[in-house]
C-alpha cells in the first residue's frame, strides 16, 4: 500500500520527513495530544489540529487505496483488466474517479441496455458505434428481428439504449461534464407546498455551485427533507447534451450511424448522466457543507471549553424557572456544594420579598462573591432580580457582588443523567442544574466535559450532520482541550479523567476508585498501580496528569516522566535544584540556557530543541494554564433590557456563537445580537472565524432593534476594539 507521505506533505505544506514521522507515530497507536506535546522532534512541532487533519486525510487516502484494490480485483476476475485501465486506476486521486472507471464493469440491475443485450442487439450497437458512412443502421437492423424484437425500429431503439449506457459509463465523458457542471451549474430551489415557512426565501432561488456557502446548502437540504422545497441542479441542458454528442457522434463523417449515436448521447445525458451527476454533486456540496459546519462547531466548542476559569471565588448558581421556581446552589472555590434552595423571584408569584431575604441570607452566610445566572426560561426576570439584590446589598452591607449570565445549554441533560445522580445522589434533579451552572463559571472545562458536546449550544445544523463524523470531531476537540490544560490527578472527576490521552472510561473510574481506597496520589509513578493502566497508557497520559502538591516538583509540571532525568540534568548544569522549580529564582533559567547554548545543552541532555524549550518553560511556570492568557469573562452588576437599546449605542459584549453568516454577541439584555459577517470588519472577510471566536470580548454598535421579533442588529465597523 502506498506510503502517502509525499502527497500529504504537498497538500498540507509540510516536510515529507515530518509527515512520515507523524504517520509512524499514529500507526504505533499514539494519541494525538501525546504526539503534539511530546514528539515534536519527529513531527516538526505539528499542533493537534494539524495532526488531526493529517490523520483524517491519511484515512481517506488509505480508504481510496482499499477501494482501488477491490475494483482491480473485480475487473481482473471478469477478465477485463488492461494496462491502460490499471494505469488509470493507479492515477485516480478521488473515489469518484475510481467509481467512474469501474462503472462499465460494475454489476448492474436490469436496465434498458441489459434487456437489449439479452435480446442479441449488442453487435448492432457495436456496428453503429463504428460510424462507418457506408453503414445503413436501419437496413442492418432487419437482421436482428425475433420474437422480442418485432421490427427494425425496436432493434434500433434497443441498440440506442446500449449505446446510451456505454456513453453514460464513459469515465472521460463524466469527467468532462463534471468540470462543466462545477464551472457553470447552479443549485436551484422552488416551493413544494403553497404555504409560508421559514424557507420562503428559497421559494425562487438559484446560486452557482462554485459560490454557494455551506449554510445555504444545509438550509436547502433541510427544506427539501421537510417537504417545503424542490431542489435540483440547473445547467444549460442543450449545451451539456451537445458536449456529450460532440465526444461521441462524428456527424460530418459518420453517416446515418452518427445520427443514432447523437440521439443515444443526448438520451444518455438527460436520462442517465444528469440525474447521476446531480446526485453526486449535490452529495459533494452537502458533504463539504457538513464538514464546514462540523469545523465551525469544533472551533466554537474549543473556545467555549477554553474560557478562562474564575478561580478562588464562592459562586451562587441560579437556574431560572417559573412554575418550579428558581433553583439556587452555592459552591465554594473548589466546587463543593455549600447550600441549596428554591426561590420565586418572578413578580407574578408575589414572593419576591421572600426570595430577596433568602438570597441575601445565602450570600452573607456563605461569602458569595459572584452569581452565575442561567439564560433559559425566566432568565431575564431572574437577571433583573439578581441585579436588584446586588444593588441592595451594596447599599445595605457595602457588599459589591457581580454576576454573569451563563449558557445553561445541556445543564438539564446533565442534571438528569446517571453521572449527575452518582455525583449528587442527595440533591433533586433541578438543584443539580444550579450546581452545574455555578461550576461552569468556576471552571468551564471541568464542568462541560460532563455533557455531550452536541448539547452545549454552539453548533449550526448539528442534527443534519453525519453523526459519526460529528462525534469524532467533537470528541477530538474535547480531548485536545483537556490535555492542553492538564488535569489535577487528585481532584479530577471520572468524566474529566477519561478525556486524558490514553485513559479509557473504565480506567478513569479505576483511578477514582484507587484514590478512594488508597488515598491521594503522591507521585505519578503510582499510576502504574492502577488496574488497567499499562505501560502504553502510562506513557500517553502521565504528562497530562499533574500533582500540584507532590514531593517531586516535576510531578506538578507538564514535563513527561521520560524527561525527568533530562530536566534534573538541565537544572544541575545551570546551577539550580529541583526544589526551586516554580520559584522566582528560576526566572534566570532561560538566560542561563541561552548563555550555555541550546545546541550544547541538547547534546548533553539527549533531547531535541523543542523538548528543551518545553522543559524550560515548565520549570519556570509549572502547570501553567493556557486559558490564563485569554480574555477574562465579562462580569456585570446592573442589567439592561431590550427596550433600553437604541441605534448608535456602543456596548461591550461577549461572543457566544460564531456561524457561517456572522456572530451572536451577548450584550447583557438576555437576547443575543447578530453581527452579520459584512459588519465585522471594514475589510472583506470570507468567514467570521477569521476575526472572532467564542468568548471574545468585543465592542459593538447597535444598528437596529426589533423588539417584536426580538432581533438586534450590530456592527463592529468603525468601533475601536479594546486590546
Functional labels for PLM-detected ranges:
Residues 34, 50-52, 60, 64-317, ...:
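Duplex nucleic acid-engaging cores and interfaces of nucleic-acid transaction enzymes
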Residues 143-146, 150-152, 205-208, 222, ...:
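Low-complexity, acidic/Ser/Thr- and charged residue-rich accessory regions of DNA metabolism proteins
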Residues 31-32, 47-146, 150, 484-629, ...:
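Accessory alpha-helical DNA-binding modules that contact the DNA backbone or grooves
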Residues 280-289, 293-298, 455-486, 603-643, ...:
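Long, charged amphipathic helices and adjacent flexible linkers at domain junctions
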Residues 19, 340-347, 370, 416-429, ...:
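Short beta-alpha connecting loops at secondary-structure transitions
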Residues 179-186, 318-322, 376-378, 405-413, ...:
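A glycine-rich phosphate-binding loop feature that marks nucleotide/adenosyl-phosphate handling sites
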Residues 13, 308-309, 479-513, 637-675, ...:
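C-terminal accessory/binding modules appended to enzymatic or scaffolding proteins
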Residues 97, 404, 410-411, 415-485, ...:
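Long, charge-rich intrinsically disordered scaffolds of nucleic-acid metabolism proteins
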Amino acid at each position: 500500500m502506498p506510503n502517502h507521505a509525499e502527497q500529504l506533505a504537498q497538500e498540507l505544506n509540510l516536510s515529507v520527513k515530518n509527515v512520515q514521522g507523524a504517520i509512524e507515530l499514529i500507526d504505533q497507536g499514539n494519541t494525538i495530544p501525546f504526539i503534539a506535546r511530546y514528539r515534536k522532534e519527529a513531527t516538526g512541532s505539528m499542533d493537534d489540529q494539524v495532526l488531526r487533519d493529517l490523520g483524517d486525510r491519511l484515512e481517506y487516502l488509505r480508504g481510496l487505496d482499499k477501494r482501488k484494490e477491490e475494483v482491480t480485483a473485480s475487473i481482473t476476475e471478469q477478465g477485463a483488466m488492461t494496462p491502460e485501465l490499471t494505469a488509470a486506476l493507479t492515477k485516480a486521486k478521488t473515489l469518484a474517479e475510481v467509481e467512474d472507471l469501474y462503472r462499465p464493469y460494475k454489476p448492474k440491475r436490469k436496465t434498458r441496455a441489459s434487456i437489449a443485450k439479452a435480446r442479441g442487439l449488442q453487435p448492432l450497437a457495436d456496428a453503429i458505434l463504428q460510424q462507418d458512412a457506408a453503414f445503413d443502421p436501419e437496413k442492418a437492423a432487419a437482421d436482428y428481428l425475433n420474437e422480442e424484437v418485432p421490427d427494425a425500429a425496436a432493434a434500433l431503439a434497443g441498440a440506442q439504449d446500449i449505446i446510451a449506457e456505454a456513453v453514460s459509463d464513459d469515465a472521460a465523458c463524466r469527467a468532462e461534464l463534471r468540470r462543466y457542471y462545477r464551472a457553470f451549474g447552479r443549485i436551484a430551489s422552488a416551493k413544494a407546498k403553497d404555504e409560508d415557512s421559514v424557507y420562503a426565501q428559497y421559494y425562487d432561488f438559484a446560486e452557482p455551485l462554485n459560490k454557494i456557502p455551506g449554510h445555504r446548502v444545509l438550509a436547502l437540504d433541510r427544506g427539501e427533507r421537510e417537504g417545503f422545497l424542490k431542489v435540483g441542479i440547473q445547467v444549460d441542458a442543450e449545451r451539456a447534451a451537445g458536449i456529450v454528442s460532440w465526444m461521441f457522434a462524428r456527424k460530418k463523417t459518420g453517416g446515418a450511424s452518427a445520427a443514432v449515436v447523437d440521439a443515444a448521447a443526448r438520451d444518455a445525458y438527460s436520462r442517465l448522466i444528469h440525474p447521476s451527476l446531480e446526485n453526486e454533486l449535490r452529495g459533494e456540496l452537502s458533504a463539504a457543507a457538513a464538514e464546514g459546519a462540523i469545523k465551525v462547531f469544533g472551533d466554537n466548542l474549543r473556545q467555549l471549553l477554553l474560557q478562562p476559569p474564575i478561580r478562588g471565588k464562592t459562586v451562587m448558581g441560579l437556574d431560572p424557572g417559573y412554575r418550579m421556581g428558581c433553583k439556587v446552589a452555592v459552591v465554594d472555590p473548589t466546587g463543593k456544594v455549600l447550600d441549596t434552595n428554591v426561590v420565586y423571584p418572578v413578580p407574578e408569584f408575589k414572593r419576591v420579598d421572600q426570595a430577596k431575604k433568602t438570597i441575601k441570607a445565602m450570600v452573607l452566610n456563605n461569602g458569595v462573591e459572584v452569581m452565575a445566572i442561567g439564560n433559559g426560561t425566566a432568565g431575564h426576570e431572574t437577571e433583573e432580580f439578581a441585579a436588584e439584590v446586588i444593588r441592595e446589598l451594596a447599599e445595605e452591607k457595602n457588599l459589591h457582588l457581580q454576576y454573569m449570565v451563563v449558557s445553561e445549554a445541556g445543564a438539564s441533560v446533565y442534571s438528569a443523567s446517571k453521572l449527575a445522580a452518582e455525583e449528587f445522589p442527595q440533591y433533586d434533579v433541578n438543584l443539580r442544574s444550579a450546581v452545574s451552572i455555578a461550576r461552569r463559571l468556576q471552571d468551564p472545562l471541568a464542568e462541560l466535559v460532563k455533557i455531550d458536546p452536541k448539547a452545549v449550544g454552539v453548533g449550526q445544523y448539528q442534527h443534519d450532520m453525519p453523526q459519526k463524523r460529528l462525534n469524532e470531531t467533537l470528541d477530538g476537540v474535547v480531548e485536545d482541550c483537556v490535555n492542553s490544560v492538564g488535569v489535577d490527578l487528585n481532584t479530577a472527576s471520572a468524566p474529566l479523567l477519561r478525556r486524558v490521552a490514553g485513559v479509557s472510561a473504565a480506567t478513569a473510574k479505576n483511578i477514582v476508585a484507587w484514590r478512594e481506597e488508597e488515598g491521594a496520589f503522591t507521585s505519578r509513578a503510582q499510576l502504574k498501580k492502577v488496574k488497567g493502566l499499562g505501560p502504553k497508557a502510562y506513557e500517553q497520559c502521565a504528562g497530562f496528569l499533574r500533582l500540584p502538591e507532590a514531593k517531586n516538583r516535576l510531578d506538578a509540571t507538564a514535563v513527561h516522566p521520560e524527561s525527568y532525568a533530562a530536566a534534573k540534568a538541565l537544572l544541575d548544569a545551570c546551577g539550580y535544584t529541583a526544589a526551586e522549580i516554580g520559584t522566582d529564582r528560576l526566572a534566570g533559567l532561560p538566560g542561563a540556557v541561552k548563555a550555555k547554548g541550546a545546541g550544547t545543552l541538547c547534546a548533553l541532555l539527549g533531547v531535541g530543541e523543542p523538548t528543551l524549550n518545553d522543559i524550560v518553560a515548565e520549570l519556570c511556570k509549572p502547570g501553567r494554564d493556557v486559558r490564563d492568557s485569554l480574555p477574562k469573562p465579562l462580569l456585570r452588576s446592573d442589567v439592561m433590557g431590550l427596550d433600553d437599546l437604541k441605534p448608535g449605542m456602543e456596548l461591550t459584549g461577549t461572543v457566544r456563537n460564531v456561524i457561517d453568516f456572522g456572530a451572536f454577541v451577548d450584550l447583557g439584555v438576555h437576547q443575543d445580537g447578530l453581527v452579520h459577517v459584512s459588519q465585522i470588519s471594514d475589510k472583506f472577510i470570507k468567514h467570521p472565524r477569521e476575526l472572532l471566536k467564542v468568548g471574545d470580548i468585543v465592542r459593538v454598535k447597535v444598528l437596529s432593534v426589533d423588539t417584536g421579533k426580538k432581533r438586534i442588529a450590530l456592527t463592529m465597523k468603525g468601533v475601536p476594539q479594546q486590546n
